[in-house]
């Protein structure tokens, strides 16, 4: 209904937040053109991956028949203030923040061995990029990876969050618990060629901002 409304009301711009879960595991940064629809999606991302791809195709369809400019951002792992910090609903970043900042015994359980690789983008960087893309012409359809372009292992992420918390803590990796053995570095050359401001918040700075926000807004509630 939203896409049809863009068509009916001659909306100038439509931005869809897709993601990178449709990509296969890779040791090298993955570009938009590396995606092969004939490859099976990773089982754990089957539902969300195909849903995102369906909406991407609907954006492509409407881009062919109306004047609306469609922007599809394949976001990496978005993190920061107002993330989901409920352990029943959160992803790896939000869950780790909660586990570290609420920890009482100095032992931090982590699923898997920490070798998974992810790209992370701070939420304010996402909003700034969205605003810039909305303020300029991008053509009928733009599909672009959107992330920091700097991948990190889960073990490195956990260590940085512990450092930012100021707590002394021992990490206990649990290899018998569910973990996703995939690597998801992404190539962000395409979006960087378009953006005037290519800078992104470093992971260390983003974590520190998030820890401060959590302590001011979650721990006090």
Question: What are these regions, as identified by a protein language model?
Answer:
Residues 1-45:
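Conserved Rossmann-fold NAD(P)-dependent oxidoreductase catalytic core, especially the SDR/UDP-sugar
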Residues 4, 42-76, 95-105:
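Active-site Tyr-X1-5-Lys
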Residues 22-24, 46-47, 68-93, 116-117:
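Flexible, glycine-rich beta-alpha linker
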Residues 34, 40, 44-56, 86-94, ...:
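Short-chain dehydrogenase/reductase
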Residues 53, 78-94, 103-107, 123-124, ...:
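Glycine/proline-rich active-site loop of Rossmann-fold NAD(P)-dependent oxidoreductases
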Residues 113-115, 141-144, 152-159, 166-183, ...:
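C-terminal "lid/loop" region of Rossmann-like NAD(P)-dependent oxidoreductases
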Residues 126, 130, 146, 157, ...:
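Non-catalytic, hydrophobic alpha-helical segments
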Residues 203-221:
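Amphipathic terminal alpha-helices
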